[in-house]
Every structure is written in structure tokens, then in C-alpha cells.
């Protein structure tokens, strides 16, 4: 009832009528509601909304005066049935007294504004506020510095396999030089023996020829110088020139061998 009730009752007798809640098939039910807190900005001239959900859950939405923030208040609670409680309703305009049976008692508490009701539709009709620019997300925290990890140590390789030392090469060079020296010495010795044989053979031929001349008769006239025996001079020339060339090569090879040995000793 939104009308102003007269707190004073007259002392006259009135007819009391039982309301519809006392019928076998009641067409109406009455409830009592208790609020823990009701804001002063609630508009009492507007209708509210009451919703009953599962498990006797009750949601009540009451509008506020236009321009208030928030535009409504939502209450939530539970209902409990009454056993033998009634309420007296007095209509001061008609002077009628009606007694109604109470069905349940509802106790609610104030919550935040929400709900899908007529009041919510009224709110949607109001101009929407421009959306506020969203703030950029905060930068990620700096990552801690980590020292670079060392690669795992691989199998160690011996330096001799990767970089072979020059000592084996020097040994090979020494062997080659010594082999050449031996070959040259053999050649020189063989050439010397052949030259001595040729000289001895030429001497024996001269002796035999001279003795034969004495036995047979007078000696033949001397031949010109260019018709001297063929084997005497080339044999001497070959015997003298060849040892000289081989001795020079021997000296060169020996010097190289000494230098290589001295170089290997200095490296050691």
C-alpha cells in the first residue's frame, strides 16, 4: 500500500471480513518482507520486482530516484512458511477491514545492482556512457641475466694426429740422402776400377805390339797424331772426368745431410 496510513484507530466497531487467502483455493497470498538495510534513495512511487527461484530463493529489485547512482538496489534472501500468522489490512478510503492469512516470511540482504527486470530495461533506455580507453598492458618483468653456458667438452684429440711433427719427414730425407750417397760411392768405385783396367789393358797392348815389331822387323813408320789409338785417351778422359763430377755431387749430398742433421738437433 502506497497510501498514507492513519496511525490512530477510532473506537467504533467495524465489520471484519476474511480475505481470499482463507478460501479453499486461495487466489492470493501474502508475505512479510524484512530488509537488513533499505537506502533512502529508493523511489517509493515506482513498482519493484520480486522473483522466487529454486530452493525458496528470493530476489527483490527496487528502483532508485532518477539520477541516483546506482540506479537500483538488489536484495537477496530466503522465504520461510508461516503457520498461524495473519495480517489486518485497513482501507482508510472505504473503511473496510480485511483479515488475510500470511503464507511466508521473507528476509533479504542488500547486494550489488543486477537483474533482468523492468528496471533493467529502464536502465538500458538511458544513454550509454562512452567507453573509457583501455590501458595498455604493463610491460613484462625483465628477465634475469644468465651467463652463457659452456658447450660440453668433446673427446680430446691428440695433437700428433691432427698436426704431425716434421721429424718423420726429416728422417725420410736423411734416408734418401744416405741412399744417394751410397749409390754414388758405388758408382765412383766401379768407375775407378774400370779406368784402371782400361789403362792396364792399353799398356799391355803397347808392350805386345812393341815386342812383335822387334821380332818381325823394323818398326812401322809413325802414324800421324790424329790417328793415335782410340781407347787410350777417351778412357783416361772418362776415368778422370767422371770421378770429379761424382765427388762434387757427393760433397753436395753430404753437406745437405749435415745441414738436415744439424737442423733436427736444433729442433730437439
Curated annotation (Swiss-Prot):
Protein's organism: Mus musculus (Mouse)
UniProt keyword annotation of Magnesium present: no
Family annotation (InterPro entries): EAF_fam (IPR027093), Tscrpt_elong_fac_Eaf_N (IPR019194)
Entry GO terms, CC: Cajal body; intercellular bridge; nuclear speck; nucleus; super elongation complex; transcription elongation factor complex
Annotated signal sequence range: none
Protein name: ELL-associated factor 1
Protein task: Acts as a transcriptional transactivator of ELL and ELL2 elongation activities.
Compartments where located: Nucleus speckle; Nucleus, Cajal body
Feature: compositional bias, Pro residues: 128-154
